[in-house]
Amino acid sequence: MKTKTLFIFSAILTLSIFAPNETFAQTAGNLIEPKIINAETAQFSTKKLRKVDQMIERDIAAGFPGAVLVVVKDGRIIKKAAYGYSKKYEGSELLRRPAKMKTRTMFDLASNTKMYATNFALQRLVSQGKLDVYEKVSAYLPGFKDQPGDLIKGKDKIRVIDVLQHQSGLPSSFYFYTPEKAGKYYSQERDKTIEYLTKIPLDYQTGTKHVYSDIGYMLLGCIVEKLTGKPLDVYTEQELYKPLRLKHTLYNPLQKGFKPKQFAATERMGNTRDGVIQFPNIRTNTLQGEVHDEKAFYSMDGVSGHAGLFSNADDMAILLQVMLNKGSYRNISLFDQKTADLFTAPSATDPTFALGWRRNGSKSMEWMFGPHASENAYGHTGWTGTVTIIDPAYNLGIALLTNKKHTPVIDPEENPNVFEGDQFPTGSYGSVITAIYEAME
């Protein structure tokens, strides 16, 4: 398999971070002019980086669909590569001529939306003094309160920080889009879903454990909309991505001039898990350029705090650099260093959780970070096959974007959520991340 690999790229500016925002604008330099560099310039072994290629290429040869990898070190993209195919299937049938993956291919980020849309927005609002993470959720969403018949009470005590740390008591998910499962909260209308979100009952007492929650991040997206008076997609695109000059990071891209062929395909047969799932209005075509997540697509019109964002390697490199710069890029300050530190600090009860971000807080996170990341590394994953790693100790950022769900479901009747692509090392992330760290000298 021929791999499109570039070890030399346009430089990304590594900026010093100044705590006062007004000082930053006066002292920051312009973007460094593009330079031709090799991996050794950034203290990487070209030979060992080739092992990363070989690892992914082996998976491609064995049936893994495709991937794009970008690595940022010391303010420069030192590796960007495309592997395999952006689309191999049309429905259940293999294409005679699968579409090759390109480094500019755009991906459904799935739950990385939580970080690079919702968290970025929240971090900006906190930095501007418009949001207090220690304030009650109900202060921003008055409808967020206990309902008659709720077995577990206490929504009036839940703070924004509890939701960010995934210890609010909210359930992991909810099937709004399926009438049999949602009952009175069935909704395939965005406004109605937002109303119902505040009424979903708690699953456990706040603060007693960490349960990763899409519902929590859907609510956080609603808080952004309430505070800004703008839909989440409009706010993030105007206030975050436009100042950064990002052209390929957005919600609902097919409604904004992009074509399906520009995207990595996800599930082969819509949301049917190879034909075993049914609900009203379910998609059955191969998904390409539409958000895969059911709650986001059917119940939130493609725009939600937990899923829906698309991006590509070049844009992700800049977003990684913003975090490495603790909020700034070029002469733009999205949020200040104090806010960046607040959001990436470990939870007192579980060091693998920060405010939204996942941290390399214990060996339990080795599947994502590998064994060599620093204890202060943080990042996130997305169900469709995306992982991002930010390691301040090494001034290192990694985005591995895959379309691992663009493969058959292994056993639809037994478990409709396990795809062939999940079983490959590339789709499990940790081995690729480990090889990248081992290439550093």
From Swiss-Prot:
Catalysis: reaction(s) = Hydrolyzes the link between N-acetylmuramoyl residues and L-amino acid residues in certain cell-wall glycopeptides
**Gene3D superfamilies, per database record:** DD-peptidase/beta-lactamase superfamily (3.40.710.10)
Stretch forming the signal peptide: 1-25
The coiled-coil segments of this chain are none
Ordered alphabetically, the record's keywords are: Cell wall biogenesis/degradation, Hydrolase, Signal
Indicate yes or no for the key word tRNA-binding. no
EC number of this enzyme: 3.5.1.28
Question: GO BP, one example?
Answer: cell wall organization
PANTHER family in alphabetical order: BETA-LACTAMASE-RELATED, BETA-LACTAMASE-RELATED DOMAIN-CONTAINING PROTEIN
The entry's family comment says: Belongs to the peptidase S12 family.
**Designated name of the protein:** N-acetylmuramyl-L-alanine amidase
